[in-house]
């Protein structure tokens, strides 16, 4: 799995370099930049290192930041009892079934129906659930949610999405700098620095927004895989039951708080335009995919 992911990463970066080379050749940008003292290869390497570096720093800090920002209380199995002990035991059993190292397990207090997995590697991961999820879902549904999150860990989704984000970061940095430099040459010398600075900021924001559509697309494909993995671990019916409970919570007109919480999670949404930025496919599509699968 690791070699396959690295191979995909290398292939993606080769395609990035080839695409940039073709674009610069067709537009005649390369000689123009060289004539003005900008080395295209050096800029590309710089953007790649910073883009990937930022993505991996975020990955390395992901577990720490999640605990701090979400207020996750990690369960100590030596002193846990009641619902905490039951939750820990469920994760332990599912992790053993998936042949995974035991992750840290935590609970954070929030009315939203949510759970997530994070961490830089399979051996250093965290699975956390909200108190709202534990209050809303029954045992079978909780089992499905936990299996889904552990499937993310087993599939290496945190690393995969980091690689994709790093490539997008590199693209954003590279093209925003190239275009901002080209725009700055169209004004007087004394205004070039200001134009280049402002254009770089505006283009970086614009390209980042467009790049997030690409990242969200890949994230949605990983969600389907995690659903399939969760179905294998906990059973298809448990996985479907969990998603159906989420859908009922989201669709309940009297529960606007639950609707807002799920919309914040980007689990689903009624705005077709915003669906491009959603990291999760529509719940209806996920349920249908599971019902049509053979798990």
Curated annotation (Swiss-Prot):
Its cofactor is Zn(2+). Its main location: membrane. The keyword Transmembrane helix applies. InterPro entries: HtpX_protease (IPR050083), Pept_M48_protease_HtpX (IPR022919), Peptidase_M48 (IPR001915). Zn(2+) binds at residues 148, 152, 223. The active site is at 149. Pfam families: Peptidase_M48 (PF01435). Keywords: Cell inner membrane, Cell membrane, Hydrolase, Membrane, Metal-binding, Metalloprotease, Protease, Transmembrane, Transmembrane helix, Zinc. One of its GO terms (biological process) is proteolysis. Its EC number is 3.4.24.-. GO terms for molecular function: metalloendopeptidase activity; zinc ion binding. GO terms for cellular component: plasma membrane. The chain crosses the membrane at residues 6-26, 40-60, 163-183, 198-218. It comes from the Bacteria. NCBIfam families: PRK05457.1. PANTHER family: PROTEASE HTPX. This is Protease HtpX homolog. It comes from Leptospira interrogans serogroup Icterohaemorrhagiae serovar Lai (strain 56601).
